[in-house]
Regions:
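Binding-site signature for planar aromatic cofactors or substrates
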Residues: 2-260
């Protein structure tokens, strides 16, 4: 038999078409590939302004604060606003930020609960705590109450001094047993290096508290802050804000409206 002659040009063409077809099929299976220079750029994180731009603002449904009709002294106004916050269902409306300062640590702040109000504002804590030590060095403090839903704030400045011992003892005995145990177990703000040892100290303190209902640490202190200045702030729908400041003058108070 004679040898079969194959057209080389035709064979090369068929081979080329087959390779292109196989390559195309491979691309379809692997998915489209985006060239590196046209890949989408990673989106940058939003700026702080972008994060808060859409945040809700106060729309208070409360009586407008007017200097002429405001009380002659600030405590009654504070109590009225506190009652409004309680009626509105504000969580812990008696919570406030206590600001203190010392030479070593500078200014610091933390949230506490108000214990009572008469002519002074009362709170309790250990005199050996950081805030207690700061007050011992500089008795000047500031208390800031903020009720966001009502668009209201009250800032009290004055001096914190230790009140009668019986007030501190009564407060401590009315605290939850677990809270009393925490105060007895370890000095406040002590660093915890050993969780197991801390738990054991807390268990011992619980046993002490259960055994003696009258147990009150010597360092537990009721502080009273006689206000020297009280500034009240209220957001309104018609204006950005209204501010009134009360300054103590002897046994009286001077009121002034402040520019926002």
């Amino acid at each position: 038999m004679g040898a079969r002659v194959v057209d080389k040009a035709s064979s090369d063409s068929e081979t080329s078409r087959t390779c292109r077809t196989d390559a195309a099929a491979g691309r379809e299976q692997a998915g489209a590939v985006t060239p590196p220079d046209t890949a989408p750029a990673a989106s940058s994180p939003p700026s702080f302004r972008d994060r808060v731009r859409g945040a809700a603002s106060p729309s208070p449904d409360v009586a407008e604060l007017v200097l002429a009709s405001s009380p002659a002294e600030p405590v009654s106004l504070f109590l009225r606003w506190l009652d409004d916050a309680v009626a509105a269902g504000v969580v812990q409306p008696h919570a406030f930020t206590l600001s203190t300062a010392s030479t070593a640590s500078g200014p610091t702040a933390r949230t506490l609960l108000l214990k009572d109000v008469d002519d002074s504002f009362w709170f309790t804590s250990s005199s050996l705590s950081p805030k207690g030590r700061q007050i011992a060095e500089d008795e000047r403090v500031a208390l800031t109450f903020f009720w966001a839903a009502q668009g209201r704030q009250v800032r009290v400045t004055g001096s914190a001094v230790a009140g009668p011992r019986d007030v501190a003892e009564e407060d401590f005995r009315h605290r939850h047993p677990d809270s009393r145990a925490v105060a007895v177990a370890v000095p406040q703000s002590t660093e915890v290096d050993d969780d197991e040892a801390a738990d054991e100290a807390l268990d011992r303190a619980r046993a002490e508290v259960e055994a003696d209902d009258d147990l009150v640490p010597d360092d537990w202190t009721a502080y009273r802050v006689l206000p020297m200045s009280v500034e009240v702030w209220q957001a309104t729908t018609g204006r950005d804000q209204v501010r009134v400041r009360y300054d103590r003058v002897g046994d009286d108070w001077r009121r002034a409206s402040l520019w926002p």
